[in-house]
């Protein structure tokens, strides 16, 4: 059983962290997501949504159930239990149908949320999402923020090249892109990869959506850029052996709610 305590906010120098105490294998760890002070008000302590999304692939891969002290959004839990978990388990060789123990809430926690965001990783997929949003004629879907979430991609993907150096270069270029488009650049940090110690390819979708839900009081819409894996390449069979982006169309649908799409 993985036990996740009620989220709370801690200060870390000039930044603030959304933190939860996690008990796994009889060891307690602090799991945190850090943002600059101006985003503190958007960190969500009232729900466990972010931490459930983030821990789910680990629990399913290692046969663990999940207990959460803070409530979960009822719509989100319903989608996970009735659609996401059965679909993944039935199309894999090794995944476990984790049981989730949590109270639920039906109230929309981010009523009045106004943010529209997407990642700014400097990849072709994120550039497409930025271009599509900025020039769409539907103005309520125009971007308000570009984001850089440090949730494990650099540590796995660029470990041989030097993750700190590569991240610094990407950040510098990403800030320039944000400035050229007149958008704020939201830069966060997390110890996600220390808690969910799995190859990032298997969890990248969950890692990014964990970050999104940590700030769910900000977002009404978030674009998850997913290169190459549209309807024509959707793949669920043996999903535990492949990049989680292969089934983003399922994951993103199941992990959307009335308050956050």
Report each predicted region and the residues it spans:
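N-terminal, positively charged, Ser/Thr/Ala/Gly-biased leader segments
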Residues: 23-45
């Amino acid at each position: 059983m993985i036990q996740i305590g009620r989220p709370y906010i801690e200060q870390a120098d000039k930044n603030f962290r959304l933190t939860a105490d996690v008990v796994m294998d009889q060891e307690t760890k602090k799991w945190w997501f850090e943002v600059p002070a101006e985003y503190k008000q958007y960190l969500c302590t009232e729900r466990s949504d972010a931490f459930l999304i983030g821990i789910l692939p680990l629990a399913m891969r290692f046969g663990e159930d999940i207990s959460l002290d803070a409530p979960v959004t009822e719509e989100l839990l319903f989608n996970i239990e009735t659609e996401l978990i059965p679909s993944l388990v039935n199309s894999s060789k090794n995944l476990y149908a984790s049981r989730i123990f949590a109270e639920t809430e039906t109230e929309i926690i981010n009523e009045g949320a106004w943010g529209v965001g997407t990642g700014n990783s400097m990849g072709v997929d994120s550039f497409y999402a930025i271009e599509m949003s900025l020039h769409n004629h539907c103005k309520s879907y125009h971007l308000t923020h570009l984001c850089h979430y440090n949730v494990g991609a650099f540590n796995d993907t660029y470990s041989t090249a030097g993750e700190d150096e590569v991240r610094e270069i990407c950040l510098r270029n990403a800030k320039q892109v944000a400035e050229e488009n007149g958008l704020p650049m939201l830069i966060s940090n997390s110890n996600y990869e220390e808690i969910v110690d799995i190859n990032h390819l298997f969890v990248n979708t969950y890692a990014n959506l964990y970050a999104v839900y940590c700030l769910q009081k900000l977002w009404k819409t978030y674009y998850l850029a997913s290169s190459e894996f549209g309807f024509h390449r959707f793949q669920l069979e043996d999903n535990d052996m492949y990049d989680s982006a292969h089934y983003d169309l399922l994951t993103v649908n199941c992990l959307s709610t009335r308050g956050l799409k």
